[in-house]
């Protein structure tokens, strides 16, 4: 009995403090995974713009990351503003074209894991401005029609048919199926066939000729329509068909709805109560 209690205690402590995810690809997650920073800033856009962009936080976050700085300034000569946006929106979109993989891994991991509570978000999520600008760009460029896009991944975890999922971070996908099948080594891989209704085509706004790459959001929820084996010539792969379901912002207006000073003690009390139960 004591061993069981000890294991439970270890599990609780691990859940409470070990929030680091797997860097690399944007993971496909069950929608019950609540650690993702999925803020859509509904109802607090102006406050977010002032807090994250005009107050100097963006500059501070840029100064704290050389990778962020490099990607941000790589396409400075491009001034194609999005409708209703500012030059910072364009710069944020260009990050996904010019950032090195190491920085994107760091950013993706932070988005996937730093939404545990307001305290961690406020103190440890160092890309608030970039996250806001990307989400706001998608809102400003709200699509009139949905679009089908694709992503090839090594991730062997296949979601169950009928389940609802989302990506753990922003994710780049390609809308050209023929190009993908001819240029990607798909043997043993997983192909996500994605119908998305909340996306942005960065190429339209960062002076790029690539009009087939789309950027998706961690706030978009998909229903798994089908999971099946497919063949492309002599290459076998798994196709996972995802259809847009809804948008879900678990942490909407995270910085403004409740302060970290309020949320953090509540979270700590709940963890301590659980610990005492097993002692």
Which residues make up each language-model segment?
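Internal glycine-rich, Lys/Arg-flanked active-site/core loops of soluble domains
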Residues: 51-200
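N-terminal signal peptide
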Residues: 2-4, 12-45, 274-279
């Amino acid at each position: 009995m004591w061993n069981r209690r000890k294991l439970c205690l270890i599990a609780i402590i691990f859940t409470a403090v070990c929030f680091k995810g797997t860097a690399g690809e944007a993971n496909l997650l069950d929608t019950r995974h609540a650690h993702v920073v999925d803020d859509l800033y509904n109802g607090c856009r102006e406050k977010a713009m002032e807090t994250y962009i005009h107050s100097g936080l963006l500059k501070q976050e840029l100064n704290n990351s050389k990778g962020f700085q490099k990607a941000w300034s790589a396409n400075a000569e491009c001034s194609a503003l999005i409708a209703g946006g500012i030059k910072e929106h364009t710069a944020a979109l260009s990050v996904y074209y010019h950032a090195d993989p190491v920085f994107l891994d760091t950013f993706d991991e932070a988005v996937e894991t730093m939404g545990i509570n307001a305290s961690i978000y406020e103190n440890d999520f160092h890309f608030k401005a970039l996250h806001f600008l990307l989400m706001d760009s998608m809102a400003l460029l709200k699509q009139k029609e949905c679009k089908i896009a694709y992503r090839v991944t090594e991730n062997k975890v296949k979601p169950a048919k009928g389940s609802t999922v989302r990506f753990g971070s922003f994710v780049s996908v390609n809308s050209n199926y023929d190009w993908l099948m001819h240029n990607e080594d798909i043997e043993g891989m997983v192909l996500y066939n994605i119908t998305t209704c909340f996306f942005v085509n960065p190429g339209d706004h960062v002076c790029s000729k690539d009009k087939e790459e789309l950027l998706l959001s961690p706030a978009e929820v998909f229903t798994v329509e089908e999971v099946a084996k497919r063949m492309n010539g002599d290459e076998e792969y798994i196709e996972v068909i995802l259809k847009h379901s809804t948008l879900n912002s678990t942490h909407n207006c995270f910085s403004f709805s409740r302060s970290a000073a309020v949320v953090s003690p509540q979270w700590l009390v709940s963890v301590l109560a659980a610990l005492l139960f097993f002692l």
